[in-house]
Design a protein with these regions (language model features):
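Structured segments of extracytoplasmic/periplasmic soluble domains
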Residues: 71, 75-76, 98, 145, ...
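N-terminal-proximal low-complexity accessory segments that begin disordered
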Residues: 37-41, 130
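Acidic-aromatic substrate-binding/catalytic surfaces of carbohydrate-active enzymes
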Residues: 41-43, 74
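Short, aromatic/basic amphipathic alpha-helical patches
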Residues: 137-153
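Structural signature of tandem-repeat unit edges
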Residues: 30-32, 45-67, 77-90, 100-114, ...
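Intrinsically disordered, low-complexity repeat and linker tracts
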Residues: 1-31, 40, 149-162
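Beta-strand/loop substructures that line and gate deep hydrophobic ligand-binding cavities in soluble
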Residues: 122
Length: 162
C-alpha cells in the first residue's frame, strides 16, 4: 500500500523533499491551501548562497513560493548571495535585516507587490541588488520600494526580463 498523504493546513510549517530526503536548509509556512502557496520563513543554511526557489514539493504536492517571510535572513552573518524565485510577490518586514555580509541580491521585479519595513536595513554597504524587470518603469518602481525598505548605500542593476 502506498503511504497516505497528510493534507496541508494553513500556517503549517513544512520542509521540502528532495531525492526522497527532507531538506533542513529552509522552512516554509503554508499560506494558502487551495492556491498551493507557501512563504519562505527561515533558513538554517550555513552556506554563503541561498536560493529561494520558484516552487517546492511537500508530500508529493507542488507548492508555489510566493513570499520571503519576516526576518527570514535577519542577522544571518554567513549569507553573501540570495536569489529570489520568480513567484515572489512579497518580501516581509526585516527579511534581510542586519544580514551584514549580504553583498548580492537578485529579485524578480515583475512580480513583487510589497516589501516590508526595514527589509533591507543593515545589508552590506554597496550590496548589489539586481532587479529583473520587463521595463525601466517597473524597475524604477521596485527600486523605490527597496529603498523605502531601508536599502541605503546599495547599488542597483537593471536586467531586462519578460
Amino acid at each position: 500500500a502506498s503511504p497516505t498523504k497528510t493534507p496541508l493546513k494553513k500556517n503549517q510549517t513544512v520542509k521540502p523533499v528532495k531525492n526522497n530526503k527532507k531538506s533542513d536548509a529552509a522552512s516554509y509556512k503554508v499560506t494558502d491551501v487551495k492556491k498551493k502557496t507557501v512563504t519562505y520563513s527561515k533558513t538554517k543554511t550555513t552556506s554563503k548562497k541561498a536560493v529561494v526557489p520558484d516552487t517546492i514539493t511537500v508530500n508529493g504536492t507542488k507548492l508555489k513560493v510566493t513570499a520571503v517571510g519576516a526576518s527570514a535572513f535577519a542577522g544571518n552573518k554567513k549569507i553573501k548571495t540570495v536569489t529570489l524565485g520568480k513567484n515572489i510577490t512579497k518580501i516581509g518586514t526585516k527579511a534581510f535585516y542586519k544580514a551584514k555580509n549580504l553583498s548580492q541580491i537578485t529579485v524578480n521585479g515583475n512580480t513583487i507587490k510589497s516589501i516590508g519595513k526595514n527589509a533591507f536595513s543593515g545589508v552590506k554597504k554597496n550590496c548589489k541588488i539586481t532587479v529583473r524587470a520587463k521595463d525601466k518603469k517597473q524597475y524604477n518602481k521596485i527600486v523605490k520600494l527597496i529603498k523605502k525598505a531601508g536599502a541605503k548605500k546599495v547599488k542597483f542593476a537593471y536586467k531586462k526580463k519578460k
